[in-house]
Amino acid sequence: MRYKVSENLSDRNGVVTNLHCFLMRSLDTGFKTKWSGLWSPPYKYLDYYGIRINGIWLDSDSVQAVEYGDQMTLHHDVGGIRVKENIAAPSDTPGIEVTLELESKNKEKKAAHVMLEAGVDIRHKSQDISHEDYNIETGPNRVRLARGRKNLMITSEEELNLKGDPYQREHFPGEKQECIVPGKIFFKKELENAETINFRFTTSEGSFGSIEKRNQNFEHDKLDRLFKYSITSVKNLIYDKEGIGINAGHPWFQSYWARDTFWTLMGLIDAGYFELSEDILTNFAKRENIPGKINLEGENRTEYSGESDTSPLYLIAADKLERHFRINDQIQDGIQKAKHNLEIDQKGVALHSPEGTWMDTLNRERAVEIQSLWLEATERQNMDEKGELEKGLNLFKHEDYIKDSLRGDDIATINPAIPLMYGQIQEEDARKYLEKINAEFSSRYGARTVSMLEPDYSSSGYHTGSSWGLTTAWS
């Protein structure tokens, strides 16, 4: 699905992706932060590109509207020339393709002198500035820039006329960045009818797979749009870098976080993406344990194991896939690994790292959602510990709400929505707790993380009041 916007473009960002890379930019044409540009996680390749036609830049003054979806199309008006700037990330391309459609507004023959400036910045995401030198090679219709073992190719089907010497440029998209401009690249077109110019930015390695296609339609128009936008958003985060996986978020969370992945799989399975879900669960299962995160580069790619909800979420997601489709032997092995990670105290409470919950900025021992997820997992997997965990969950129940954790200084959070969602609370109590959620957690943007009546509540607090899509879906 695509939609068209023409207002507040400077406040909106767009992302175009395939299984290999993503390009992020502002819809007003800008590359405004160090996270903008072309990335093949976890490496950056391009800080920005700029286009000038007959001496006029395609920028916030020229752009009239933007169509946004699986591609990004910017509509410009430049000195009597209509320009459509289309940015796509084809599945068979380890990079992006930019196509300019040029048309004279008065239908008279007109020359279009087009200049492309590219700010190349090949570096790891952990670096702001790399001091390695570039090697630049030119050939017919191409420019290749290499730094270390990574390279970026600028190619075109048109005659690519490179002029001027390469130069280093400092710029400040929020923070100081350095890039190299290989020279100015020129194209020329005589406009009698509509003409096109295309060029590509491609990296040194690629993933050329594609995601299975599904088509679902809702009779309710708004729900139909919401569902399709949600699926598109998830697909934008899928990569084939260290096996198939889902990055936690653009632009900076460039790893496969288990928690984010398994929650997302619940929706993907419901939407019918069975083979994709199987591949992702298999990718986690074939590791030594079920890791809390898979990094896309480095020697210790699964070193982080701090997610306390990784194992129960894996068990729940695997069960859901099995009921809807199938699971393979590797996923079965993953299920056994996950089961062994359950630890319970004498009161039937699940033990876990205080820093390992989704609210990882808070120290939360014996958290209610971990208890609830393990209870749901034991029921799905017919584990003997189910009865103990049911008794343990009763310790969280309070007269007017469910405790967030069993700490003495407990606060009212949205996390009790999880046992409510899984039907683990008796109906009479559930109604009472839902009334509190509706009164204290509901906002125009969704479900708050913390009750607005808490002394430390902050509407912009990461885990202390802001509304999340995750918490809203639970509620």
What are these regions, as identified by a protein language model?
Residues K84-I87, I290-S311, A317-H324:
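Aromatic/His-enriched, Gly/Pro-containing loop or helix-boundary segments
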Residues R225, Y229, R259, W263, ...:
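Generic recognition of stable, solvent-exposed alpha-helical segments in well-folded globular domains
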Residues S6-G37, R364, V368-S372, E376, ...:
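Aromatic (Trp/Tyr) and acidic
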